[in-house]
Amino acid sequence: MEPVNPSLEPWKHPGSQPKTACTNCYCKKCCFHCQACFITKGLGISYGRKKRRQRRRPPQDSQTHQVSLSKPSSQPRGDPTGPKEQKKKVERETETDPVH
């Protein structure tokens, strides 16, 4: 081996870069082409943006098989008379029963 110039960065050393360019092929030879190819093709690791997968739309027939749930009625819960009448009851009780 020839001595390497210490002023060069490690990624610029002779022989550190492959002689051929990287390709989109996923064969065994191309997967082991260089470290970058091995990581992306061989191991399947990519740090770029993930592409959105389009969801498969279900066939139109499958929607008819789903059971439709009845919607709950919009009745107020709690006291059916409402808060206004309750206030009136409290006022009447205080008028009829003077404690002080």
Swiss-Prot record:
Residues 1-48 are annotated as: Transactivation. Keywords: Acetylation, Activator, AIDS, Apoptosis, Host cytoplasm, Host nucleus, Host-virus interaction, Inhibition of host innate immune response by virus, Inhibition of host interferon signaling pathway by virus, Interferon antiviral system evasion, Isopeptide bond, Metal-binding, Methylation, Modulation of host chromatin by virus, Modulation of host PP1 activity by virus, Phosphoprotein, RNA-binding, Secreted, Transcription, Transcription regulation, Ubl conjugation, Viral immunoevasion, Zinc. The keyword Transcription applies. InterPro entries: IV_Tat, Tat_dom_sf. The record marks W11 as: Essential for Tat translocation through the endosomal membrane. The modification Asymmetric dimethylarginine is found at R52, R53. Zn(2+) 2 binds at C25, C27, C30. The modification N6-acetyllysine is found at K28, K50, K51. One of its GO terms (molecular function) is actinin binding. Residues 48-57 have a biased composition (Basic residues). There is a cross-link at K71 (Glycyl lysine isopeptide (Lys-Gly) (interchain with G-Cter in ubiquitin)). GO terms for biological process: DNA-templated transcription; positive regulation of transcription elongation by RNA polymerase II; positive regulation of viral transcription; symbiont-mediated perturbation of host chromatin organization; symbiont-mediated suppression of host innate immune response; symbiont-mediated suppression of host translation initiation; symbiont-mediated suppression of host type I interferon-mediated signaling pathway. The keyword tRNA processing does not apply. Asymmetrical arginine methylation by host PRMT6 seems to diminish the transactivation capacity of Tat and affects the interaction with host CCNT1. Acetylation by EP300, CREBBP, GCN5L2/GCN5 and PCAF regulates the transactivation activity of Tat. EP300-mediated acetylation of Lys-50 promotes dissociation of Tat from the TAR RNA through the competitive binding to PCAF's bromodomain. In addition, the non-acetylated Tat's N-terminus can also interact with PCAF. PCAF-mediated acetylation of Lys-28 enhances Tat's binding to CCNT1. Lys-50 is deacetylated by SIRT1. It holds the Pfam family Tat. Residues 22-37 are annotated as: Cysteine-rich. A motif (Cell attachment site) lies at residues 77-79. Residues 1-24 are annotated as: Interaction with human CREBBP. A motif (Nuclear localization signal, RNA-binding (TAR), and protein transduction) lies at residues 49-57. HIV-1 lineages are divided in three main groups, M (for Major), O (for Outlier), and N (for New, or Non-M, Non-O). The vast majority of strains found worldwide belong to the group M. Group O seems to be endemic to and largely confined to Cameroon and neighboring countries in West Central Africa, where these viruses represent a small minority of HIV-1 strains. The group N is represented by a limited number of isolates from Cameroonian persons. The group M is further subdivided in 9 clades or subtypes (A to D, F to H, J and K). The cell attachment site mediates the interaction with ITGAV/ITGB3 and ITGA5/ITGB1 integrins, leading to vascular cell migration and invasion. This interaction also provides endothelial cells with the adhesion signal they require to grow in response to mitogens. Transcriptional activator that increases RNA Pol II processivity, thereby increasing the level of full-length viral transcripts. Recognizes a hairpin structure at the 5'-LTR of the nascent viral mRNAs referred to as the transactivation responsive RNA element (TAR) and recruits the cyclin T1-CDK9 complex (P-TEFb complex) that will in turn hyperphosphorylate the RNA polymerase II to allow efficient elongation. The CDK9 component of P-TEFb and other Tat-activated kinases hyperphosphorylate the C-terminus of RNA Pol II that becomes stabilized and much more processive. Extracellular circulating Tat can be endocytosed by surrounding uninfected cells via the binding to several surface receptors such as CD26, CXCR4, heparan sulfate proteoglycans (HSPG) or LDLR. Neurons are rarely infected, but they internalize Tat via their LDLR. Through its interaction with nuclear HATs, Tat is potentially able to control the acetylation-dependent cellular gene expression. Modulates the expression of many cellular genes involved in cell survival, proliferation or in coding for cytokines or cytokine receptors. Tat plays a role in T-cell and neurons apoptosis. This is Protein Tat. It comes from Human immunodeficiency virus type 1 group M subtype B (strain 89.6). The gene is tat.
